[in-house]
Amino acid sequence: MWNRTEDQIEIHLTLIRHWATLSNKEGRYLGKTDETLSPDGISALEKSVADRIYPTADVLFSGPMKRCLETAQILYPGQTPIIIPEWTEMDFGAFEGHNYQELSKDPNYQRWIDSGGILPFPEGESREEFIRRSVAGYEKMVYHMKMIWERSAASGQGDRKIQSVSAVVHGGTIMALLSHFLGGEYFDYQAKCGQGYSGRLAFKAGKGAPQWKEFRPLSEVTVSEVTVSELTKGETNG
């Protein structure tokens, strides 16, 4: 996958939270329920496409749920996403489908709040389990990228130059991946629907896992059509 003049390949990675569903609008815990985007969510998404606020993608990944796939289809028409099965949202268990007002008198919910979100969701998933699952999905994404490079090299076309990768996922997936790879608190990386984070992955020949570099909120990246060169100047739920 490496040509003779390169000992490092860097790609731009954008993690995008899907646009809004009705449950998102109502503040409900939306995990394993496979809900579609709401009409308002679709309208906002289509406007974002018209405004060209998202980067282009040489390769597109997505979680398997409808809200991610619909977002990916509208953001990147004509591109078929590679689906990562591990990138479903966290299983909220007994809290699924409920909002704060409905749960406010539930002692199990109060215990979960008091724990700072550390306790496992009753009848659901723990944060540690969810992070492990999300990271396993990321490793699968990296595997797919390496296979693309290797297939292009084997075909005699040389390395395929992947410069920009987008992944449409859930808010929880973004928090899981960034807290794992960048450090900090899990909830430091919350993203609203349609928002996310952008940065670079640096792959070094023979150096194992890629390094995460310079990730920042997508809202801080002012672009009409993002290119890697523009973004690398000046190195420095549901």
Short names for language-model regions:
Residues 75-136:
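Phosphate-handling substructures
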Residues 182-213:
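Domain-level recognition of soluble alpha/beta enzyme cores
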Residues 2-4, 11-79:
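Active-site-proximal alpha-helix that buttresses catalytic centers in soluble enzyme cores
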Residues 57-64, 149, 159-168:
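Short glycine-rich phosphate-binding loop at a beta-alpha junction
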Residues 6, 53-86, 111, 202-238:
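Conserved histidine-centered catalytic loops in small-molecule metabolism enzymes
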